[in-house]
């Protein structure tokens, strides 16, 4: 199997901002355009749907599982789209060591990352979430501060169809380079 120079589209924001919707939309649009891509879903969301609250006491485990989900596709497809970037593990980290480890793992892919902050546009849906709308908006602020404070370059798009279309166009342009 040939090793591909994979672009990782990392969607950042708090819960309910449209990361999963955007990831699914961008994935579908790219796939329909014949682009070899994969959607890497959020491990933590799987645990919410399983009613597994115990796992949320171990952010190290969650971050490791998410990292593995991304790494198993890296180099095998042209584009990975994820609604749970490895660096989000640092935002939710309960120790400084985990924060540093999450950032170090994320930075392994630095040359391949397209980091995107989703600006909240849609109505908040609490179903499948552990946070209230207010808490989710606070996490939006924390995530953006985290990106800025850690010198992680990113672009912002609105969490709506128009914003996701801009992202699809951006990815297609990057693939031409």
Protein language model features and the residues they cover:
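Phosphate-binding P-loop
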Residues: 1-8
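Walker A (P-loop) phosphate-binding loop of P-loop NTPases
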Residues: 16
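Conserved nucleotide-sensing/catalytic segment adjacent to the nucleotide-binding pocket
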Residues: 52-98
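A glycine- and Lys/Arg-enriched "phosphate-lid" helix/loop adjacent to the NTP-binding pocket
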Residues: 96-162, 166-175
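Hydrophobic positions on the alpha1 helix immediately C-terminal to the Walker A/P-loop
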Residues: 22
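Conserved substrate/cofactor phosphate-moiety recognition/catalytic segment
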Residues: 27-68
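Conserved lysine of the Walker
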Residues: 19
């Amino acid at each position: 199997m040939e090793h591909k120079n994979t672009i990782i589209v990392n969607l950042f924001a708090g819960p309910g901002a449209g990361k999963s919707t955007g990831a699914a939309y961008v994935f579908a649009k790219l796939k329909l355009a014949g682009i070899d891509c994969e959607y890497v879903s959020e491990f933590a969301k799987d645990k919410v749907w399983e009613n597994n609250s115990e796992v949320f006491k171990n952010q190290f485990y969650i971050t490791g599982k998410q990292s593995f989900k991304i790494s198993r596709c890296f180099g095998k497809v042209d584009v990975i789209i994820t609604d749970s970037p490895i660096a989000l593990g640092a935002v939710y980290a309960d120790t400084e060591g985990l924060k540093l480890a999450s950032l170090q793992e994320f930075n392994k892919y630095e040359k391949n990352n397209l980091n995107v902050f989703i600006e909240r546009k849609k109505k908040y849906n609490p179903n499948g979430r552990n946070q209230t709308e207010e808490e989710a908006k606070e996490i939006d602020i924390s995530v953006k501060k985290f990106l800025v404070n850690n010198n992680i370059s990113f672009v912002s798009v609105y969490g709506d169809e128009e914003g996701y279309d801009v992202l699809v166009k951006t990815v297609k342009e990057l693939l031409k380079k």
